[in-house]
């Protein structure tokens, strides 16, 4: 059954933009017109009021818990600075405690003139109300009082992956190899659920380190669904969309054409996996010019497997299984293929990563998957060869994982 069929959206007037392309640089969308309203422009105010009424009609049909603005102001001590735990182009995030239940939550207060508008607000509430998975952040509820727009999430005590990988303070301990693979696997499983289990499929469209939240045990959950879109259904191969996302993470074909597929998310995942392997930001202007773009810098290394260890984050200090690192780099390279059709499915990625953890307790588990669909007669020779190469790499990763775990159980056998 289509889980989105019970919601009806009014067609809204599209607001003209200065540019057809929008990106987030350093976590923020660029190229967008904030379209601030002014009292001296009654038409704009009337249109905003009309949109607010339409938004209320949609949100009234959503089953998520509703909060009053007063309740959330109380929970966050009137949005005090001491409760602030994050901010960006969309607004601010506060840590709060719900008075009625005592639950600790994260409250995202959207900037009314910011980068996440009413449409993105509704998309996020809708998506997270209908999609439930252990690797998606849990939406507790929302507030749509007047022109206030707030989202209430479960509180993730470790913050974001960005906090622990790319914004380390001098006293922070770098993530070890197993934790990095655990985080990568969690994010991959979240994407796999969106692509393969949701009906219709959902394209996340904004995967990045800042949107991967971590609980106390460093389990990863995807957050911020304001840019998510329903994927193609039936005979359609893609959906067309105005280019949105974060600079450096967008798939090249989506950037060029605006044509969006689940393989666009696979590319973004490849970027995040490469960040986990290297400890580098995808775009870092503080580095030498030829190293500022992470993917461009890594591409020559992808062609020489003997050089894969060069990509390892120096903060790991060599403490990682070299073959597991090589397989992780191979997975990242496949995800970052220029041609979208030869990138792996997220189910392939989940399988491969599930065998690259080295924890003795086997805490990184791999769920059961159905057999992948067989290629049609119309599949090109190039696609078939690429699929075989992908399957071979996944098989090698699985073989390595089995051997590694067997060795950890019986080291004297080697």
Swiss-Prot record:
The residues covered by the Protein kinase domain are 79-356
| EC number annotated for this UniProt entry | 2.7.11.1
- UniProt modified residues of type Phosphoserine: 240
- The residues listed in the UniProt record as binding ATP, with positions renumbered to this chain, are 85-93, 108
Example GO CC term: the record gives: plasma membrane
Localization, UniProt? Cell membrane
Which is an annotated GO molecular function term of this record?
A: protein serine/threonine kinase activity
* Annotated Pfam families: Pkinase
Annotated region Disordered: the residues are 17-55, 364-394
Alphabetized PROSITE patterns for the sequence: PROTEIN_KINASE_ATP, PROTEIN_KINASE_DOM, PROTEIN_KINASE_ST
PTM sites of type Phosphothreonine: 246
| Entry keyword Kinase | yes
> GO biological process annotations for this chain's record?
defense response
Q: How does it sit in the membrane?
A: Lipid-anchor
Query: Compositionally biased, Basic and acidic residues: which spans?
Result: 17-41
Quote the PTM field: Palmitoylation at Cys-3 and Cys-6 are required for plasma membrane location.
The role this protein plays is: May be involved in plant defense signaling.
Query: Know the name of this protein?
Result: Probable serine/threonine-protein kinase PBL26
Q: Which organism is it from?
A: Arabidopsis thaliana (Mouse-ear cress)
**Gene encoding this chain?**
PBL26
């Amino acid at each position: 059954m289509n889980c989105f069929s019970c919601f009806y959206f009014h067609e809204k007037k599209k607001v003209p933009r200065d540019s057809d392309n929008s990106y987030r640089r350093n976590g923020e969308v660029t190229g967008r017109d904030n379209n601030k309203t002014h009292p001296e422009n009654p038409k704009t105010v009337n249109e905003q009021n009309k949109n607010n009424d339409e938004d209320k009609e949609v949100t009234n049909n959503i089953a998520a818990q509703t909060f009053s603005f007063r309740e959330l102001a109380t929970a966050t001590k009137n949005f005090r600075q001491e409760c602030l735990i994050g901010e960006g182009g969309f607004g601010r995030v506060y840590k709060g405690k719900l008075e009625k239940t005592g639950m600790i939550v994260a409250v995202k207060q959207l900037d009314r003139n910011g980068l996440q508008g009413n449409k993105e607000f509704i998309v996020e509430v809708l998506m997270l109300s209908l999609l439930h998975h252990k690797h998606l952040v849990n939406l507790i509820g929302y507030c749509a009082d007047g022109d206030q727009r707030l989202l209430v999430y479960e509180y993730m005590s470790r913050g974001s992956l960005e906090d622990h990988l790319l914004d380390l303070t001098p006293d922070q301990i770098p993530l070890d190899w197993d934790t990095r693979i655990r985080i990568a696997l969690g994010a991959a499983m979240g994407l796999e659920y969106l692509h393969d289990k949701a009906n219709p499929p959902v394209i996340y469209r904004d995967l990045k380190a800042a949107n991967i939240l971590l609980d106390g045990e460093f389990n990863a959950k995807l957050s911020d669904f304001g840019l998510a879109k329903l994927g193609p259904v039936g005979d359609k191969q893609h959906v067309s969309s105005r280019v949105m996302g974060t600079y450096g993470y967008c798939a090249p074909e989506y950037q060029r054409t605006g044509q969006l597929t689940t393989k666009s998310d696979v590319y973004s995942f490849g970027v995040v996996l490469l960040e986990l392997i290297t400890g580098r930001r995808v775009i870092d202007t503080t580095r030498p010019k030829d190293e500022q773009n992470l993917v461009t810098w890594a591409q020559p290394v992808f062609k020489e497997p003997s050089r894969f260890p060069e990509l390892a984050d120096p903060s790991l200090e060599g403490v990682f299984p070299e073959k597991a690192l090589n397989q992780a780099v191979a997975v990242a390279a496949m995800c970052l293929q220029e041609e979208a059709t030869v990138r792996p499915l997220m189910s392939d990625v989940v399988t491969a990563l599930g065998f690259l953890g080295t924890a003795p307790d086997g805490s990184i588990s791999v769920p059961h998957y159905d057999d992948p669909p067989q290629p049609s007669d119309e599949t090109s020779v190039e696609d078939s060869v690429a699929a075989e190469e992908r399957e071979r790499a996944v098989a090698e990763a699985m073989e390595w994982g089995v051997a590694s775990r067997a060795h950890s159980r019986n080291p004297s056998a080697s």
